[in-house]
Amino acid sequence: MSDTPQLVVHRDKELMAEAAAARLITKIVDAQSSRGSASVVLTGGRNGNGLLAALAASPARDAVDWSRLDLWWGDERFLPEGDPERNVTQAREALLDAVPLDPERVHAMPASDGPYGTDVEAAAAAYAEELAKAAAPENHATVPSFDVLLLGVGPDTHVASLFPEHPGVRETERMVIGVHGSPKPPPTRVSLTLPAIRTAREVWLLAAGEDKANAVAMALSGAGEIQAPAAGARGRARTLWLLDAAAASQLPRTMYPPASA
């Protein structure tokens, strides 16, 4: 497990999104070259969608073999299919509809008007089963080997739909949970848990804007994961925080090299 996070601070959110998109393209191409395919977990929110839009606008996107890419989600708002607030709907608009993905490899979380109806626990269990089916049986794993897992960091330090002091952030067994009573609407969601997040080779946390500065400082200053879920998001090989200058404004400059600014 990568316990020491790496920080990269960019001038503004636009540059951060472009740089993150370039990093992701390189990571996907490298994974496809070495293993034949790549697996990425997407995040929603303004920074996650900004990265996808930057990727869509990048000429280098054509280096990716989109037919050999598995896409998963870290969390989802439990709303009807096609609802504009669903992360998958926003991802399709930002990028997915513009690239030749294999539909069988786009693993959206269930919607509230799907086969499980409004039973969010059944929806979470179904997604956990889908993850398990895609896992390598020889590794006795319950989730696939994610090359990169993307997470946005909320102003309250939440990641995915794991909120401070809520039951979900305390989960230690299940890979996917139904979330009830989210402090951020809508109240019902599906989310990966910290144990699932920590199986990823690399976890990238995205934060931009002055409203994220306190959360970033809290998560990187030794806060516990129950109080600051972002502090508990770590990759097996690498944990990378991609920030803009505003989000990094409460960090001591000794935490990141001047060249990264």
Task: Locate predicted features.
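Ligand-binding beta-strand-loop-alpha-helix segment within the catalytic cores
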Residues: 2-4, 64-147
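Glycine-rich N-terminal segment of FAD-binding domains in flavoprotein oxidoreductases
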Residues: 29-59
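Glycine-rich beta-strand-to-loop/alpha-helix junction loops that act as flexible
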Residues: 42-47, 151-155, 208
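Class I SAM-dependent methyltransferase SAM-binding "motif I" and its flanking Rossmann-like core
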Residues: 148-195
